[in-house]
Regions:
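Start-transfer (signal-anchor) and selected internal transmembrane alpha helices
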Residues: 1-23
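Short hydrophobic helices that act as membrane-entry/anchoring signals
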Residues: 3, 7, 46, 133-136
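Short alpha-helical segments used as structural interaction elements across diverse proteins
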Residues: 5-7, 37-40
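Helix-to-loop transition at the C-terminal end of transmembrane segments
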Residues: 24-38
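Extreme N-terminal leader/anchor segments
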Residues: 31, 39-49
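Interfacial juxtamembrane loops and adjacent helix segments
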Residues: 50-141
């Protein structure tokens, strides 16, 4: 046990430090600047759509793991496609406006669906994606 602070105070200090570190980390790594960010996004959409367990299927004749999601998701991701591995390219108001326009047509319940492979993130438990999935679900409502 660490002395100096009551346990309740320690909890609040740790929570505050984690929130500050998380905020700084999210500012240091802009949206879609990481190589597998699109796969994390697809996993969030899958969970928000009620797909807790990834699908295993053949995609272009090869085994693939992922999910059947709204076909127009690609439109929502397109504005960010040139960001990964290009640290000189930043998210701009123009990119965000285009993404907002394209996401406006996005519906989690769209009957037009296609299979998206996301083999790396489909291995993860849904638990880390619950808050983002809830936000996506509330935003779509």
């Amino acid at each position: 046990m660490v002395s100096g602070f009551p346990s309740k105070m320690r909890l609040w200090l740790q929570t505050g430090m984690i929130l500050i570190a998380g905020a700084l980390y999210s500012l240091a790594t802009p949206p879609f600047q990481v190589s597998d960010e699109f796969n994390h996004f697809l996993r969030v959409v899958q969970i928000a759509s009620g797909g807790w367990i990834p699908e295993k299927t053949l995609n272009q004749g090869k085994p693939a793991t992922g999910g059947t999601l709204p076909a127009n998701l690609e439109r929502a991701m397109t504005p960010f496609r040139n960001l990964p591995f290009h640290v000189n390219v930043k998210t701009s108001p123009r990119i965000l406006e285009q993404a907002d326009r394209d996401a406006g047509a996005l519906s989690l319940d769209s009957p037009d669906r296609r299979f998206y492979p996301f083999p790396n993130t489909s291995l993860y438990s849904p638990a880390p994606y619950l808050s983002q999935s809830l936000g996506l679900k509330l935003g779509a409502a």
